[in-house]
Amino acid sequence: MEPPRGPPANGAEPSRAVGTVKVYLPNKQRTVVTVRDGMSVYDSLDKALKVRGLNQDCCVVYRLIKGRKTVTAWDTAIAPLDGEELIVEVLEDVPLTMHNFVRKTFFSLAFCDFCLKFLFHGFRCQTCGYKFHQHCSSKVPTVCVDMSTNRRQFYHSVQDLSGGSRQHETPSNRPLNEPLTPQGPSSCTQHRDPEHFPFPAPANAPLQRIRSTSTPNVHMVSTTAPMDSGLVQLTAQSFNTDAAGNRGGGDGAPRGSPSPASVSSGRKSPHSKSPSEQRERKSLADDKKKVKNLGYRDSGYYWEVPPSEVQLLKRIGTGSFGTVFRGRWHGDVAVKVLKVAQPTAEQAQAFKNEMQVLRKTRHVNILLFMGFMTRPGFAIITQWCEGSSLYHHLHVADTRFDMVQLIDVARQTAQGMDYLHAKNIIHRDLKSNNIFLHEGLTVKIGDFGLATVKTRWSGAQPLEQPSGSVLWMAAEVIRMQDPNPYSFQSDVYAYGVVLYELMTGSLPYSHIGSRDQIIFMVGRGYLSPDLSKISSNCPKAMRRLLSDCLKFQREERPLFPQILATIELLQRSLPKIERSASEPSLHRTQADELPACLLSAARLVP
């Protein structure tokens, strides 16, 4: 019979204290409990565990007898253990540990992990790395969570589902864009019925990995997506409004007015002008109009390159959005001929408006935009990158990078994406294929923007379909429930998958061979990259940043300013071996230190 675990009933005499027991608790803590008659080990240690955020279900208790640990049941009476020592340890399969908070002043740029606001004075856990304000302390979990251990059990259940789901019917009668809610692993294992969890039938061919050094083919065919180009259109409209004002002359004539002279002739001037003065004013107005029109053409017209000036040399690769060629135009360039067959007037105007935004991008981690072509089809000219893509280095050439180099690649990628987002440019197709290592380890991000090309059009209206590669797609992009699912957070999710490639050296979901199954499970929240495969020497802060970037809810993902600040702080904290300033060369011989005159004199001595 289980002993009582609550206080004594009314009228009962309180248990009498007969001694003490010394208890060693997790995280190098210890306490002394009083031994009372009629109480068990469970009751005696209940308060000591609760104040430390633990409970008996996640712990095991040992008796320390002659230096050896012996497992003891929780319902053992405490009275016979008077004067002995007990040891309480957390179960190995329960990834829980206590926080180790310290007060900290963040002199470098840092953000609170809960309110995501700027953090200067606050607290930090030395174990899991949580940073927070004092008023955000109520949101901190009571225990530290090791995400790599916590997800391991979940992935075993997912693999069981993926292995045993081939006999289920395909969800052809169940559209993917119905309301989706993420389910926990328990719900996945309980509902094996096809009506509750219908898996798509796996394809015969596994996922293909395109091994091209340039922009290769993506994993979805004919799945270009709409893009809300509101930001681009607002910029273009304001630009066109200013240009229209310039073409109207300096007197503020409307766009539809025939000429500045006709407007000026309609005004009543207080002084009559002679015909010669009127002709002089008209000629001055015409000269101003010509100068301003030429200025407008300089800002946008000369970015369009005539096709006769560009020479295509070699085909590099083909993707879902176009074909990349190596070409010559005042030097080596990369020319991407876009797949837009018979563009409409709306598409042509939207493409030119977007080029007006892309031409203003200048950053060390962004491929330099050099121009565009509209005849005979849409094409973009960028700088030529001699290096290979990050995909080629990691998955084809198997290039070995040390952890410092991997973190630096992650920092440069975050720096380039932070610049694009500051320009209100959403990448929409960020992946390791579009990240190039130029002249060593300098990161160059390419194939950004291009909302006009990455949208399927039906006449003048865009179609709502996802674009990009399956492995790098966020759940909200796969579901396409929102009118515009692409956001800064969807780029953050794709960046999280790139981090996963850097820290594991492999692609996610390599154990699943069906693309449709990946789309279905990721869109519903049943599947995410397995963090237990991360390298053991990966810093704890990088592991936690990777987990945050891959959150199912996009509101919970950090933005690139916070990501960049976290990686820069991590880089500064890494140990470095620096050369001594007083000894520039460690391999200098003793003879090198002697003056030349002494050496010549030594040779003359017989």
From Swiss-Prot:
Dephosphorylation by the SHOC2-MRAS-PP1c (SMP) complex consisting of SHOC2, GTP-bound M-Ras/MRAS and the catalytic subunit of protein phosphatase 1 (PPP1CA, PPP1CB or PPP1CC); this relieves inactivation and stimulates kinase activity. Residues 19-91 form the RBD domain. It catalyses: L-seryl-[protein] + ATP = O-phospho-L-seryl-[protein] + ADP + H(+); L-threonyl-[protein] + ATP = O-phospho-L-threonyl-[protein] + ADP + H(+). Residues 158-207, 241-290 are annotated as: Disordered. Zn(2+) 2 binds at residues 112, 115, 133, 136. ATP binds at residues 316-324, 336. Gene3D superfamilies: 3.30.60.20, Phosphatidylinositol 3-kinase Catalytic Subunit, Chain A, domain 1, Phosphorylase Kinase, domain 1, Transferase(Phosphotransferase) domain 1. The keyword Metal-binding applies. Its EC number is 2.7.11.1. This is Serine/threonine-protein kinase A-Raf. It comes from Sus scrofa.
